[in-house]
């Protein structure tokens, strides 16, 4: 008898989130994908169906960060990204539904005049995000102590979320992607950007599973 291998694929760039979902435990279902291999069962974890505007892993990454921002009584969320960053759009929407102002530090100062032609920045602006555009050379130094101090002087009481949303709280949120129902899978596959989703999956996986 063939040893059946079960593979779960988790998409990275999708959309999700809803008002105060930060307080909820959200799960997604596994959709069977038919293949031409009888010894393989392939499933797609539908994190994209959690919400239309905050993508699956974006919701997971933001959940505990927003909770922490509210706990610290911060007035706004500040983060970084490019012209077509799903993270920028997700932060803008999540902030708006949680009563937090949002600030996006955007790579490319030429984009300041192109907001109407950019669907991502237009969406973020429509949900209240304020932009600070940087030249591409200046953007490379965005996490320097000098620049962070400049941001503090300009925007005051903000909660800083790294580019792509990955930090310890983001990893904690991504650990919730896998549930007890997913323990049947032998392999768990996902695409990788900043590594936050992958780290959460590794932490939450069972000893028999390979990531």
Describe each PLM feature range:
Residues 1-211:
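PLP-dependent amino-acid enzyme catalytic core
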């Amino acid at each position: 008898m063939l040893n059946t291998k079960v593979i779960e694929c988790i998409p990275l760039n999708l959309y999700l989130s809803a008002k105060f979902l930060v307080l909820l435990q959200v799960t997604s279902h596994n959709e069977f994908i038919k293949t031409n291999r009888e010894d393989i069962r392939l499933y797609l974890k539908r994190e994209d169906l959690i919400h239309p505007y905050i993508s699956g892993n974006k919701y997971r990454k933001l959940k505990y960060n927003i909770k922490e921002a509210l706990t610290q009584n911060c007035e706004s969320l500040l983060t970084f990204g490019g012209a077509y960053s799903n993270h920028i759009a997700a932060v803008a929407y999540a902030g708006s539904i949680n009563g937090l102002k949002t600030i996006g530090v955007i790579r490319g100062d030429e984009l300041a005049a192109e907001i109407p032609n950019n669907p991502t920045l237009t969406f973020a602006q429509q949900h209240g995000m304020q932009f600070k555009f940087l030249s591409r050379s200046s953007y490379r130094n965005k996490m320097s102590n000098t620049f962070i101090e400049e941001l503090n002087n300009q925007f005051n009481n903000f909660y800083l979320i790294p580019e792509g949303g990955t930090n310890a709280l983001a990893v904690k949120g991504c650990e919730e992607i896998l549930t007890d129902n997913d323990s049947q899978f032998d392999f768990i596959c996902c695409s990788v950007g900043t590594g936050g989703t992958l780290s959460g999956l590794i932490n939450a996986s069972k000893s028999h599973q390979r990531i």
